[in-house]
Structures are given as structure tokens and as C-alpha cells.
């Protein structure tokens, strides 16, 4: 099965490509490399023995996408491409709507022309906004998002939903991720953010490896057990397996399919700091800072629907998430860049 993977050089996309190859699928990667490095292709080949086809370009470039579809017999699409930092989205909303919303619309148009009507969309738990009740189920209210990143994901969900209701031969799967962390257990691949990390785990890892002085913990006065934000952290390998489960089960069935991908358990920022200190064998210095705009107090998933319909469940523990992150960061202190 040939699958176009937009953003396939990024953190989640690259790990998913490895798992796809292991499952006998053939990923065709499209990425503009705005938040990724070419070295990822070599790492995928090192892990799988195969280097996937790669086309450098932007999903907002319709002629480019049309040419990729014409060159390959693609049966489905996994759409990861997009900007993903909550804080940056507050400062740069237009860039987020342009990349995430317009890019998705251009992709859908190109798919329709090519007769490819199966898409798995990389959505986010941010579409739920600040939830009144946790755990969050797939029918929890959406749309009251607290930042432009979340709004862009919600808008794309609405666009794809409208597309399905207009043309119900599409298979559209919306995967709402919670908080992806971890790395390939080999230490060969992991998260390599450009510039200052926006997400907790790579920031902790860079502090532990000596690239940064200390971790900034944003918000210590939330109504949570230790005052710091609580999130559902999911290992990127479990997340990758969730995409393959979606392609295999509902990817060939027309419909609008929506699933949470999380563990069903919440962990606080300070709990993750402690777990990482255990993994790397030394304390991680941090300071408590004011809340960030757009952040919420707590958020974790109800995972029963994915377990029931996809036969998928996250199995890796917080200890594995932190150990694999440290293994990646200690082996690759500068990420994919040479020292």
C-alpha cells in the first residue's frame, strides 16, 4: 500500500514512516523541511533497510502535489504537515492559518483530482479547548479552542467533515493526539525542534544534556495536585502504531472516523521532570514561571473508542517515554545536526 505522508520528515511523521515500512506499507514523503532535516531519511533507512521516496515541497503548492500524485500510485494520505507550537501560534496567527488550513484545503483538492479519497488527519486534543470534564471523549464539545494552533486544527476538521457530507465516498479519519513524547528505542530517531523547544520533553532533554541551563515551568498555580499543568503524554511509537491501525481498519471504509490517541492517564509537568531525572540519573534544574497564554490546566483522553474500533491501545509507560527520550538525546546531543 502506497501512502503519501505529508510532513513525513517531522517528529511524528518520521516515526510513523518507520512503523509503516515495518508493517509492509510504502510511505511517499512530502515535506518542505521548515521544521525537519534531510538526515531523517538516512535514519529511516538505517532502521528499516529502505529509504522512502522523498519530494521536497510545500502542501500549499497544488501543482507540486499534483505532480507527486501523478508519479506514484497512491492509495491513501496521512497528513502531518503543519505548524504546531501553541505559543508561536498566538504571536503568528496568520502563518498558522495559512500553513495549517490553506495547506489542508490544497491537499484535499489535489487528492480529489487524483482520485485518492482516504485521508488520516493529524489533529489535536487542542480542539477540545479547556475541557469541563476529563477524561475527554470523542463527543466532548469542540471548537472553544484557546489558541490559533488549536483553532487551525478545528477548522481543518470542520472542512474535512463538510467534504465528507458533500462527497460521502471519502474515508476521513481525524486522530486527536494528546501530548506526543519519547523517541525510537534505538536512539537513532527522536524529536529535534528548531531553535528553543516549545514542548516539554525536548526542553527537559536539552537541559539534561547541557544545551540549556534550566527548564521554564509555565504555571504553578493551576488547580492540579502540584499546581503544574496535567497532560496525557503518549509515546511517539504508540502514536505511530495508531496511524497504522487507522489505515488498516477504517482507512478503506468510507465515513468520518474520529479517535482520541492518548494513554487515558494524566501526568503533571513536575511528575515528568522527576521521571526524566530518574531516567538520566541526575536532577533537572527548573524554575517556576507565569502561565503561558493559551495553555489549560489539565487534559487527558478517554481511549475506549480507539481500543474498541481500531484494536489499538497505548502500551508504553512514562518511564519508557523518558528513558527513550534520554537515549536519543544523549546519543544525539545536537539532534540531527553534526556536532
Task: Label every model-predicted segment.
Residues 1-183:
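N-terminal Rossmann-like NAD(P)+-binding domain of SDR-like oxidoreductases, especially those catalyzing
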Residues 200-339:
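C-terminal substrate-binding subdomain of Rossmann-fold SDR/epimerase-dehydratase oxidoreductases
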Residues 57, 69, 96, 192-196, ...:
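Pocket-edge positions in alpha/beta enzyme catalytic cores
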Residues 175, 186, 215-217:
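Oxidoreductase cofactor-interface core, primarily capturing Rossmann-like NAD(P)-dependent enzymes
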Residues 184-197, 204-207, 213:
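Hydrophobic, Gly/Ser/Ala-rich alpha-helical and linker tracts in large acyl-processing enzymes
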Residues 182-184, 221-222:
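Short, basic/glycine-rich phosphate-binding loops at helix/coil junctions
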Residues 97, 146-154, 190, 194-198, ...:
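Short-chain dehydrogenase/reductase
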Amino acid at each position: 500500500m502506497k501512502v503519501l505522508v505529508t510532513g513525513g520528515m517531522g517528529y511524528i511523521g518520521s516515526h510513523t514512516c518507520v512503523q509503516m515500512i515495518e508493517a509492509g506499507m510504502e510511505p511517499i514523503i512530502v515535506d518542505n523541511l521548515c521544521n525537519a532535516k534531510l538526515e531523517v531519511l538516512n535514519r529511516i533507512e538505517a532502521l528499516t533497510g529502505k529509504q522512502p521516496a522523498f519530494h521536497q515541497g510545500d502542501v500549499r503548492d497544488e501543482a507540486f502535489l499534483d505532480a507527486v500524485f501523478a508519479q506514484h500510485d497512491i492509495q491513501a494520505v496521512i497528513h502531518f504537515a503543519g505548524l504546531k507550537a501553541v505559543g508561536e501560534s498566538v504571536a503568528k496567527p496568520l502563518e498558522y492559518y495559512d500553513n495549517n488550513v490553506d495547506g489542508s484545503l490544497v491537499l484535499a483538492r489535489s487528492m480529489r483530482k487524483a482520485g485518492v479519497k482516504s485521508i488520516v488527519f493529524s489533529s489535536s486534543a487542542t480542539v477540545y479547548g479547556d475541557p469541563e470534564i476529563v477524561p475527554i471523549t470523542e463527543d466532548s464539545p469542540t471548537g472553544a479552542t484557546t489558541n490559533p494552533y488549536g483553532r487551525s486544527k478545528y477548522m481543518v476538521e470542520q472542512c474535512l467533515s463538510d467534504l465528507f457530507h458533500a462527497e460521502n465516498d471519502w474515508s476521513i479519519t481525524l486522530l486527536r493526539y494528546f501530548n506526543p513524547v519519547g523517541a525510537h528505542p534505538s536512539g537513532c530517531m527522536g524529536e529535534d525542534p528548531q531553535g528553543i523547544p516549545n514542548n516539554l520533553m525536548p526542553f527537559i532533554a536539552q537541559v539534561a544534556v547541557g544545551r540549556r541551563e534550566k527548564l521554564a515551568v509555565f504555571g504553578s498555580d493551576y488547580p492540579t495536585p502540584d499546581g503544574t499543568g496535567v497532560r496525557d503524554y503518549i509515546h511517539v511509537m504508540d502514536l505511530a502504531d495508531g496511524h497504522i491501525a487507522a489505515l488498516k481498519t477504517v482507512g478503506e471504509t468510507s465515513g468520518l472516523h474520529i479517535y482520541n490517541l492518548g494513554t487515558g492517564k494524566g501526568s503533571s509537568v513536575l511528575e515528568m521532570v522527576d521521571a526524566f531525572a530518574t531516567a538520566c540519573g541526575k536532577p533537572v534544574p527548573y524554575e517556576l514561571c507565569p502561565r503561558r497564554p493559551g495553555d489549560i490546566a489539565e487534559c487527558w483522553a478517554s481511549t475506549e473508542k480507539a481500543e474498541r474500533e481500531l484494536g489499538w491501545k497505548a502500551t508504553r509507560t512514562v518511564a519508557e517515554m523518558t528513558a527513550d527520550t534520554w537515549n536519543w538525546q544523549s546519543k544525539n546531543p545536537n539532534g540531527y545536526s553534526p556536532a
